[in-house]
């Protein structure tokens, strides 16, 4: 199980800028992943994983973060188009972040769209739970997929 944590510094700012510039020059495009969720989503696409587990400080995505009973436990659709429409609808309820420095639920949902279109199931859940309980469905979480 790959564990992605891009925020740990491995190069200084100037090296990072140079790396991105070099990639854009060579390939015409470069994705700059400066968020763990974005990085994990890109890697999920590259390795064609079946399940992407995004760990966070909450049990998943809420319609109202102030109301624990508003946890969205499942997002699905009859096809990938309807699934993405349902994710878009859920994003419309996302405002703010759970802590300073994070990009919040809206960004998590934005980043997982590409893996979802490739058939990956996404689970967004709390790091307080074991990976096994999140994957098995024993722990509360938001599960997104067809």
Regions picked out by a protein language model, each given a short descriptive name:
Residues 1-146:
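C-terminal catalytic "cap/lid" subdomain
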């Amino acid at each position: 199980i790959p564990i992605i944590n891009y925020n740990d510094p491995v190069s200084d700012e100037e090296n990072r800028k140079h790396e991105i510039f070099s990639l854009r020059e060579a390939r015409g495009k470069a994705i700059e992943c400066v968020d763990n969720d974005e990085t994990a989503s890109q890697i999920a696409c590259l390795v064609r994983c079946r399940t992407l587990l995004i760990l966070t400080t909450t049990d998943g995505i809420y319609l109202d973060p102030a109301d624990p009973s508003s946890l969205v436990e499942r997002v699905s659709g009859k096809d990938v188009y309807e699934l993405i429409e349902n994710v878009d609808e859920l994003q419309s309820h996302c405002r703010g972040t759970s802590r300073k420095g994070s990009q919040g639920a809206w960004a998590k949902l934005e980043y997982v769209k590409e893996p979802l279109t490739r058939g990956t199931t996404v689970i967004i859940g709390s790091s307080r739970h074991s990976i096994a309980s999140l994957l098995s469905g024993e722990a509360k979480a938001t599960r997104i997929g067809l």
